[in-house]
Amino acid sequence: MSAQGFYRRSLPDSAIAFSSVEGRQIFREALALGEMEGYFALAEQFHTQAEPAFCGLGSLVVVLNALSIDPGRIWKGVWRWYGEEFLDCCLPLSVIKENGITFDEFVCIARCNGAVVKPNRYNQSSLENFRQAVEQVTAAPGDIHLVVSYSRKVLGQTGDGHFSPIGGYHRQRDLVLVLDVARFKYPPHWVPLPLLWKALKPVDPVTNQCRGYILLQKSERLPETFFHVAFNLHQWRSVAPYFAEILPDILRKEQPDSIASFVSTILHNWPVEFTTMLHTSSETAETLEKLRAAIELNSLFDIVHECLSSDHGDAMCVVGKWRSQQPFVAETITAILLSGPETLYATLKPDLRLWLSEVRYLEKLISPLDIEISRLREQMSALQDFYTLYSKGHQCNIHQS
């Protein structure tokens, strides 16, 4: 009696298996042409996606580890390393396991995890631009990679929406190497670049947008950090209105006439959701003293600390309870005010906005505070941008490996 299910699929005629005689010959020729330089960093990290709908996460794990991005969290034992289970910053893993992720969700997750991302949808690019991007990443020694979001149907494969990294290019034959992370289904394979380009065109039936390709690099400002945004998109939905509407409306009504008055107003209306917004990495606790010293040298910290130490501190119900349960609350509040979206300050008087703009200016923040705030801003910006898309009606897509 045969077992239930399927054991792999045969590649269509349009694809050439990487391990076949012809596939190996193409590899040797591409290597000699200098078009496999990005392959080796990816090959070191190449793995099979952990779930049938994890093609996006699987591709991203390969690339994040290939770029040597430190997740700042323990994977197993004493090791910091990316696994799919870490990539829940925009959506819960349970949702991704059911539905997969869309192009925009991939971008959000990549940005939240420290990658510099350049997304390119089919209708915003061209065949020649795509070819140039492929040439760029395959000739680079592993500091930039490209992931394609494409329709398998166009390639003559089963299933539909899929993500995979590009591992190489043969310019003379115009073939690209697709490192298919669904290795239980298809092996890595060479396909004609123009055909892969056509596979980016089909419209995602949920987002009503074309698919595309994403360039990913490691941020130059990304050593290990102490603070991380602890929310995924669903949790961020409860926080975003405070930055964009609720607190700005309160500030508009109160019209504080000084920074101290502004901080006091914020602290008296501090949302309980803000108390769990930031996660701290115990693995990097040795950097805490340097970070605290840098925060305490920031003039905004002085005002936050003074407001918390005032006789009115007990009136700040949420913050007062928070202070009794956790150390470094003044430092955490300062970090949130330095890194939060600028919409929070939109209704303040011009002179107060100017003061905050100067104190938040990244180039004036001393190390390691500048790196921490840069990372937090990128994470918050990624979530805020994706929240905006989500609020317009975009939903999770179903990706079938």
What are these regions (language model features)?
Residues 1-39, 348, 366, 370-380, ...:
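Non-catalytic, low-structured ubiquitin/UBL-interacting segments
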Residues 4-92, 239-303:
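Active-site nucleophile-adjacent alpha helix/oxyanion-hole segment immediately C-terminal to the catalytic cysteine
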Residues 61-63, 172, 184, 220-222:
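Short loop/turn segments at secondary-structure transitions that flank enzyme active sites
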Residues 83-163, 167-211, 312-313, 318-353, ...:
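Conserved active-site-adjacent core of cysteine acyl-enzyme catalytic domains
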Residues 200-375:
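Low-complexity, Gly/Ser/Thr/Pro-rich intrinsically disordered linker/tail segments
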